[in-house]
Every structure is written in structure tokens, then in C-alpha cells.
Amino acid sequence: MEEMLRQKIEDAADPLRTALLYARAGNYIDFGAMNEVNENTFLSLLDSVPFRPEDEPVMESFFKACEKAERFLLITDNCGEIVLDKLFLEQLKKRYPALQLQVLVRGQEVLNDAIEEDASYTGMDQLAEILSNGLPLAGTVYERLPEKAREAMDRADVILAKGQGNYETLSHQGRHIFYSFLCKCELFTERFRVLPLTGVFAEENG
């Protein structure tokens, strides 16, 4: 399936934008939040995730930030979706070859979140430096991060955090962070006033 998805991305009019949307759709692969993860549902979501009009300026802001950036940090969520995250990083590196890529994963197994072993298994370590948050926590708590992970967050010109857990633990703390996730629980569908499995791109400017 990875090669099929890569080809669909390559064939798209804008491969980077498509890869970013696919990576967001990959947030569906969450055995911690979903009662059932269905392959057909996932494949249908790739090209049909409900798109909020307010996401468009966020995406434009994201791409403009990447154009000027030297360091990019991706904070991952579920292990199942990091193959799509890797495909996104491939396109990001093609568009901005000088961009230094880092990926922050969970430090220990928690729910079905990605750890260093998962990132290496997918080959993501061939594209980016893989960092551990040192914690078995379904989110990212800056104050509890090891020094190298804190330094990566402090030095990154662009941060993209995936998933609801990262949004809950990182938002409203005065940092400039882009967020990408599907709304999979009532808390998020009510907060963003959307239907279940609606995709969200959000930006906090600090």
C-alpha cells in the first residue's frame, strides 16, 4: 500500500499539498480512539476528508513558513500513520531540499503511539533525525521533555504536531505550532463544531 500511496501523491497536481492531506487522513489509524479501524474507510478518507474553509489560509501560512525555514520538527502521533508522515516528509524534502528535518516520537509504548523503533522500521530515519520525548505519554509536555527534545522545539522554525493528544498538551502555551488531526471524539467535534472524522489544520502564533 505504501508504494500505491506514494504513486498517488506523485501523480497529484501538488504532491506536497496532497501528501500533507494524506498524512492528516492517516490520523484515522488510531486504535486508541477508534472502536474500529477499517481499511475501506481509511482509503475513502484519503480523498474525501471533510475540509474546513478556514483550513486553507492555515495551509498557505504553513507552506510560506517552510519556504523561509531552516529547521522543521514533526511531532508524531500514532504508529499506523507514520508511513504517511514519511511520505509527507519525502515531498517536503523535495520541495525544500535545504530544510533540516527532525521527528519527535514517544519515548516508550503508550496506546498505539509511534516510538523510535516504529520510525526506524518505516525508514523515516533515512529522511530525518529521530528524537524521543522520553515519556510513555499520549501527548507532548514540554517541561518533561529530555534536553535534546526541548532544544529541538526551541530551535525549530516550523513545528507540525499531529493528533488530538499533541494538540491537548501543546496548545495555548505561547508557541508557534501548526496542528494536523482528525476530530475523533466528542470533545473535539464540539470544540471545533464539526462532524466526526473532519480534518483540522490549526495554527497558533504564540
Enumerate the language-model features and the residues they cover.
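Conserved catalytic alpha/beta core of Sir2/sirtuin-type deacylases, generalized to analogous enzyme cores
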Residues: 29-54, 68-71, 108-116, 121-127, ...
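C-terminal functional extensions of proteins
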Residues: 105-107, 117-206
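Short, hydrophobic/aromatic alpha-helical segments in well-folded domains
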Residues: 61-65, 75, 88-91, 148, ...
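Electropositive, gly/pro-rich neighborhoods at or near active sites that engage anionic ligands
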Residues: 1-69
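Structural motif
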Residues: 71-73, 157-158
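Histidine-anchored nucleotide/phosphate-binding helix
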Residues: 78-97, 102
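Gly/Ser/Thr-rich loops at beta-strand to alpha-helix junctions
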Residues: 77-86, 108-110, 164-168
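Residues at the starts of beta-strands that form the adenosine-phosphate
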Residues: 70-71, 98-102, 176
